[in-house]
Structure formats: C-alpha cells, structure tokens
Swiss-Prot record:
PANTHER family: MYC PROTO-ONCOGENE. Glycans are attached at T58. This is Myc proto-oncogene protein. The modification N6-acetyllysine is found at K143, K148, K157, K275, K317, K323, K371. Residues 251-263 have a biased composition (Acidic residues). It comes from Ovis aries (Sheep). CDD domains: bHLHzip_c-Myc. One of its GO terms (biological process) is G1/S transition of mitotic cell cycle. Transcription factor that binds DNA in a non-specific manner, yet also specifically recognizes the core sequence 5'-CAC[GA]TG-3'. Activates the transcription of growth-related genes. Binds to the VEGFA promoter, promoting VEGFA production and subsequent sprouting angiogenesis. Regulator of somatic reprogramming, controls self-renewal of embryonic stem cells. Functions with TAF6L to activate target gene expression through RNA polymerase II pause release.
Length: 439
C-alpha cells in the first residue's frame, strides 16, 4: 500500500531529532563541503571497522518512508544552491525546507534509490529497500551524497554561461539528471522479490542486480568474495549491496573509488571459525574461493587376522580334530563380531573393503566347514584314523573303497540272514511234524 502523506503534514522536529548529529545549520556557507571535511563526520568504511560503532550510543532511526520524496520541493533539490543565491532557485526555500530536503537526501533511500517518483504509483514501496543493516551504512551514504552534490555543483559552475543563460543551462542539466533518476526509479527492485525469505535465513536467495548496475557488478563480486573470506565476518544474515545512481563521465573515477570503499562487513555469511581465511584486503579476497566444509569420513580399522595360505606351514603342535574344529569356529565367530563393531560413517572405498572382507570371512567359514567334514570322514576310515596329515584326495579314495567294502559285507550279511531264515522255517516244520507223530 503506498504511503500518501503530504509534505505539509511532516513533523520537522521529529525528523530533525533523528538526524541532528549530522547537520550544523548555523553554518550555511558551503554547507556540504564543510560537512564532508568535518572532524565530527563518522569514519569512512575504509577505516578501522570497530571505530564505526562509536558513531552513536544507540542505533540511528530507520529512514522515513513517506511520499514527501515525490513533492515538487524535493524535485528542486537537484538545483539547490548551498549559498542561498538565485542561481539554482535555492533562495526561495526557507531554512526549514532546506533542512528537510537535506534530511531526505542523507537519510532517505541510501543515494542509489531514485529521488523522483510518482505519488500515485506503487513504485515508492518498490524502490525503498530495507535499510540500516549496520550503523556504518548511514555514514557511508552521507559521505557519498556530499561528494555527489559537490561534484554536481562544480560541474554546473564550470559549464555555465552568463547569468541569464546559466540559469537556463542549469535547469536543463538538472532536468536531464532528474530524467535519469526517474528512469532508474522505474527499474527498481521490489523488496518482495529480493527478499522472498527472512533475512536471517542462511539459505535465502541472493538479490539480483538490475540492468543499471552493470558498472557495479565487478566490484560487487570482489566485495562478496572478500566478505566471505574476511576473518572479521560475524555470523549475521547476508545484507544487500545497493546500486548507485547514474552519474556523468566527469565523476566516474570518483564513483568507482566510492564503490571500492563500500563497507565490506555489511556483506556477511555464516562461516565456521576454523574455516575463515586470513585475507585482509578486498583485492586479495577477490581471488579467494569460498570455504567448503565436506563431510569428514572416519575410517574404522577392523582386525580380521586373515590367514596367509601362501606362507609355509608353521611348526606348531597338531591339535586333535575336535579341538581344532572348535578353535576354527571360535576364530570365525570372533572375526564376524569384530567386523560388526564398526558402525562409524564410511566412504565408498571403505564400504567396498568391508564387503570384500565380509565375503572373505564367509568364504573362509565355508572352507572351514568343508575341512571339518573331511576330518570327520577321515576319522571313520580305519586306515586313516590316526593320520592327521592325510590329503583330501587320499581321504576320498579310501572312503570310497571303505564304502564299497562295507556294502559288500552288507550284501554278504543279508544273504546269510536269508539262509538262516530259511533254515529256521525248515526247523519249525520239522518240529511240527515230530509233535504230530507223538500225539
């Protein structure tokens, strides 16, 4: 909803109290130049960062967001003369009007926003972006406004003609400058588009610059990279670097220096303390890469006590088959239990090694089971019962021969059983005949 408040309903006392430390109206002679070179001016962004917190005991008030920016009195501020002469029409304003216009200049839209807008449109809400990210933003804006107005007045004085024609030339120059400002106002960014998420959210999208900020993009990239690598970056939300108004070619170098002096601390990013780099200047920080925090993967050592089958046989004491089978089974169970104890996060290589190790353990367990089966078969063969070093082939051959012999003996016993059964039947019949003859 646009703010439609007339210029006459403003509270001058409230506006003057909010910015009183920055103005000295007793000295109207060369006002902007004295304010720029005053000793009481807040420190520039290039100085020590901690001196900026000595600006005021409490944070300054947020800039006024009223429709007075669109008033005709405010439009005439581009041709405002600090000397109070009739060159730019400044003599028609009272001291209160001058104070109000300077207040709106220094505390309004941080210089880079447009000074001219239509009160009937909704562009006033769009071109006002949230201010006061840090205290130093206000002092940087005041210094930049003072330098711009001083350079603009110097350009007007140098390029002027005789007194009647000079006023006309000044009006045309100011109209061109105001036209550029109004063109920039139409391309301002909507705060709802720039800030779709809260500012304290670390995952909020970064603001996109408008087409007017092509000259500012290289320095903004360097400032962003230097702010990410600055050791003094505090864990605060990412602040928006605003754009500067279009200026003439006479003060392009000065504007570039001002852009390089923009406070680096206002662009901040959450960083772990251990990952902060030690770069001290924006030029050195522009070549640095943002620190990454990859997942720390810890390797877990698993002792499996693998047996080397290629090694020569050791001269250890041979245990009995039953005891050796128990030892082998216990060793396999111990290896599996040790393998399951590793529960820390692993990389892909570690997982592959663990899978291979588990496969080897299972394969070894299968071989041990097969070996125990051979040992049991060897114990059943009479010829190899006490032979601990009998090969598997011999065990298989002897077992086959023994099975055949046992089967032959079984057939022999079966035939003998049949003969005995027949003999029994014959004896039963003979006994029955004897009983019948005796009766």
């Amino acid at each position: 909803m646009p703010l439609n408040v007339s210029f006459a309903n403003r509270n001058y006392d409230l506006d003057y109290d909010s910015v009183q430390p920055y103005f000295y109206c007793d000295e109207e002679e060369n006002f902007y130049h004295q304010q720029q070179q005053s000793e009481l001016q807040p420190p520039a962004p290039s100085e020590d960062i901690w001196k900026k917190f000595e600006l005021l005991p409490t944070p300054p008030l947020s800039p006024s967001r009223r429709s007075g920016l669109c008033s005709p009195s405010y439009v005439a501020v581009a041709s405002f003369s600090p000397r109070g002469d009739d060159d730019g029409g400044g003599g028609s304003f009272s001291s209160a009007d001058r104070l109000e216009m300077v207040t709106e200049l220094l505390g309004g839209d941080m210089v880079n926003q447009s000074f001219i807008c239509d009160p009937d449109d909704e562009t006033l809400i769009k071109n006002i972006i949230i201010q006061d990210c840090m205290w130093s933003g206000f002092s940087a804006a005041a210094k930049l406004v003072s330098e711009k107005l001083a350079s603009y007045q110097a350009a007007r004085k140098d390029g002027g003609s005789p007194s009647p024609a000079r006023g006309h030339g000044g009006c045309s120059t100011s109209s061109l400058y105001l036209q550029d400002l109004s063109a920039a106002a139409s391309e301002c960014i909507d705060p709802s588009v720039v800030f779709p998420y809260p500012l304290n959210d670390s995952s909020s999208p970064k603001p996109c610059a408008s087409p007017d900020s092509t000259a500012f993009s290289p320095s903004s990239d360097s400032l962003l990279s230097s702010a990410e690598s600055s050791p003094r970056a505090s864990p605060e939300p990412l602040a928006l670097h605003e754009e500067t108004p279009p200026t003439t070619s006479s003060d392009s170098e000065e504007e570039q220096e001002d852009e390089e002096e923009i406070d680096v601390v206002s662009v901040e990013k959450r960083q772990p303390p251990a990952k902060r780099s030690e770069s001290g200047s924006p030029s050195a920080g522009s070549h640095s890469k943002p620190p990454h925090s990859p997942l720390v993967l810890k390797r877990c050592h698993v002792s499996t006590h693998q047996h080397n089958y290629a090694a020569p046989p050791s001269t250890r004491k041979d245990y009995p088959a039953a005891k050796r089978a128990k030892l082998d089974s216990g060793r396999v169970l111990k290896q599996i239990s040790n393998n399951r104890k590793c529960a820390s996060p692993r990389s892909s290589d570690t997982e592959e090694n663990d899978k291979r190790r588990t496969h080897n353990v299972l394969e070894r367990q299968r071989r041990n089971e097969l070996k125990r089966s051979f040992f049991a078969l060897r114990d059943q063969i009479p010829e190899l019962e006490n032979n601990e070093k009998a090969p598997k082939v011999v065990i298989l051959k002897k077992a086959t021969a023994y099975i055949l012999s046992v089967q032959a003996e079984e057939q022999k016993l079966i035939s003998e059983k049949d003969v005995l059964r027949k003999r029994r039947e014959q004896l039963k019949l003979k006994l029955e005949q004897i009983r019948n003859s005796c009766a």
